[in-house]
């Protein structure tokens, strides 16, 4: 069950990498400028950045299973329809439908995972959510790689059609799996609309600040490797993919900590505080290739630790029945907001003050997030020295 729900996350995150890989072909075929295609790429985060918390409440009212089915169906329809886009209107329209599908999956699947794993104890639940936290780097890399490969054989329209067919197949598997809906009692429904604990707000805001510099740095890494290191665009893209996927190794480390019942307060602080310091070794004038790439990989590995522990904290900060959906929606909204704003803000820093200015911004964002993360990790219900229950 957890694996099937994780595959839904991979499918959703693959849409993040799909359009990036197909952007040059789409721009050439439809006669669009690359900035216009770049806007289409970013549209998938708009829904999460503006409606994440609201979507969490709607998912609670509609039912998690129904929300997940609808999300995967939107991804399938958008993939098949987008393959027939004839201009900017069609491209944007199908991408917005894709954003709806993406949002439906990310607000429902992790909550279903948490509900399913809860029966096996808090430690297993934390490990399951740690697995879920890898869906973005893994799905993004998979989407970019698969789309590029299929486009080489069948063109960008063929690649998008194939992606839509995969989504249809996954929807069919979901339908036959008969997922439990985990319907809540009326009391739990009322509690879902109650105020979230301050520690949950701290976790969500800290996660947003983390995404601000983490995604911003990853987005600018190819440009730095081309302009300052002298790599080709293809090599820069490949090393950026390696850096992104290294977050999965960080998630494995987080899983090891959870499995051994370690307190996560200091791992949370270290994995949030060290990456912006490493960024000063990456975002500099004419860095050595092996130094910049090595530090970027380490930076994203540590980021994977923080992201995984943040998801593992969710069920302990949203301990009231019914609040898990809303808490997950809030975390998704803050993370999407940071992902949406981080690249343009850090690019503006580079333009105004050079690469070091972007590293300074990353440090400021991290300093703002540290006390928030400390409060969340120190909450009395969230010392993840988990027992065997």
Language model feature labels by segment:
Residues 19-20, 198-251:
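Extracytoplasmic gate region of multi-pass secondary transporters
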Residues 94-136:
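Cytoplasmic helix-loop-helix junction between adjacent transmembrane helices
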Residues 124-179:
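Helix-loop-helix hairpin linking two adjacent transmembrane segments in secondary transporters
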Residues 264-313:
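C-terminal transmembrane helical hairpin of 12-TM major facilitator-type secondary transporters
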Residues 316-355, 362:
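A late C-terminal transmembrane helix in Major Facilitator Superfamily
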